[in-house]
């Protein structure tokens, strides 16, 4: 459960990355592919897996924009993320463990780029991404 302090830290962070979703998203996704090459199997149409690849940039931006959009829905993540959970769980059949792997790559990318990524912010981001991961995995049960 996110505390009010966590929510404030998340909102501040998400506002700061709003204009950088393509760059940060592409790097996080490329990091996922490099560190966990088995995840490439979910992207058969991708011809490249670097942060400079057009499809990596596009998909990475989609993911980070979706996270930024949760800024308005921190008190109702289950409802807000339901369609994405259904798409990934029932349509794309993504192994839910991959959400945790990608969350870790997102956190590392944010830490590498944002001076504001204090220990307190790191804790809030971990809790937030853990909650997002839980909600995206919810329809697998």
UniProtKB/Swiss-Prot annotation:
Annotated ranges, domain Globin: 1-141
Binding site for heme b: 88
Keywords: Heme, Iron, Metal-binding, Oxygen transport, Transport
Keyword Iron on entry: yes
GO biological process, one term: hydrogen peroxide catabolic process
Residues binding O2, per UniProt: 59
One Pfam family named in its UniProt record: Globin
UniProt superkingdom: Eukaryota
InterPro entries on file: Globin (IPR000971), Globin-like_sf (IPR009050), Globin/Proto (IPR012292), Hemoglobin_a-typ (IPR002338), Hemoglobin_oxygen_transport (IPR050056)
Known role: Involved in oxygen transport from the lung to the various peripheral tissues.
Stated family: Belongs to the globin family.
Protein name: Hemoglobin subunit alpha-1
The organism's taxonomic lineage, starting at the top: Eukaryota, Metazoa, Chordata, Craniata, Vertebrata
């Amino acid at each position: 459960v996110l505390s009010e302090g966590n929510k404030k830290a998340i909102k501040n962070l998400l506002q700061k990355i709003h204009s950088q979703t393509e760059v940060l998203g592409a790097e996080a996704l490329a990091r996922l592919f490099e560190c966990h090459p088995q995840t490439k199997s979910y992207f058969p149409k991708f011809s490249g897996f670097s942060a400079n690849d057009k499809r990596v940039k596009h998909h990475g931006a989609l993911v980070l924009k979706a996270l930024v959009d949760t800024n308005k829905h921190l008190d109702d993540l289950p409802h807000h993320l339901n369609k994405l959970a259904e798409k990934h769980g029932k349509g794309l059949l993504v192994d839910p463990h991959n959400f945790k792997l990608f969350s870790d790559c997102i956190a590392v990318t944010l830490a590498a780029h944002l001076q504001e990524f204090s220990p307190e912010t790191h804790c809030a981001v971990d809790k937030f991404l853990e909650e997002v991961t839980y909600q995206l995995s919810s329809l697998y049960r």
